[in-house]
Amino acid sequence: MASGISLESILSPQISKVTKTTDNLIITIYGYGGLGKTPVATQMEKPYYLAFGKSGLSGLNNVPFMPVMSWSEFKNLNKILCARKNYEALHQQYHTLILDEMEVLYKYCEEYVASTNNVQKIKDGNGGYGLWGDLKDEWEKEMLRLIGSGFCVVFILHAMANDDGKVMPVGDQKRMLPILLNHSEIIGYVKGNGVNPETGRSIHSSLMLAGTDEYFARTRNEYFDPYIPDFTAENL
């Protein structure tokens, strides 16, 4: 019998409760550029920002961050962040992990899998059949480790319209996105509200939390409103 499991523990289970904190919460937000995704995410509780490629922190002060330029760097960082022995020390300083430009991180993963198999591109490996299974396994292994870390994790992606005109997160629909979207309690589409004609300033974006024919969004919490009119960290 597995350690810690007994008849008594089965008959006296833990009871779930609706969470009132962001502990262990997995959030995916996506949208077109310049709508405030990164500024809002970095206002979450005790943030630690992982920058893939070009940092989105220009114009933002006092945000703890780590530039990550390869999949090997990410794997090493992820191992430290998710190690149980480091949990207490890390959580005293950080509560929210922000992963910006997830499509860039996935590109890192592609390059890593191809390189470790001595080919230029994923499609060239495995005798020309491609390394698609290896890519999916490598990506999901690290994402699952992060998802189970105990942090509030915020994934940030760009948006694109599919062939039907519906706005979706950018990324590989078969291998990259499923592990992120299937484990997210919140998938929010950041929708711009244009400019205030009187002041000439941009109006705060809205966060859409219920999907329509126009865009994809959803939450697992029936108590959430279908959208947040004023998209701020506090309102989220």
Regions flagged by a language model, labelled:
Residues 161-236:
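Conserved GTP-binding G-domain of TRAFAC-class P-loop NTPases and closely related GTPase folds
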Residues 19, 39-41, 145-147, 177-181, ...:
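A general structural signal for short secondary-structure junctions and capping/turn motifs
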Residues 102-179:
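P-loop NTPase motor core
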Residues 8-108:
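Conserved P-loop
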Residues 48, 111-112, 196:
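Single-residue recognition of alpha-helix boundary sites
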Residues 1-4:
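Charged, amphipathic alpha-helical linker segments immediately N-terminal to NTP-binding catalytic cores
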Residues 47-49, 153, 186-189:
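Short, well-ordered beta-strand core segments
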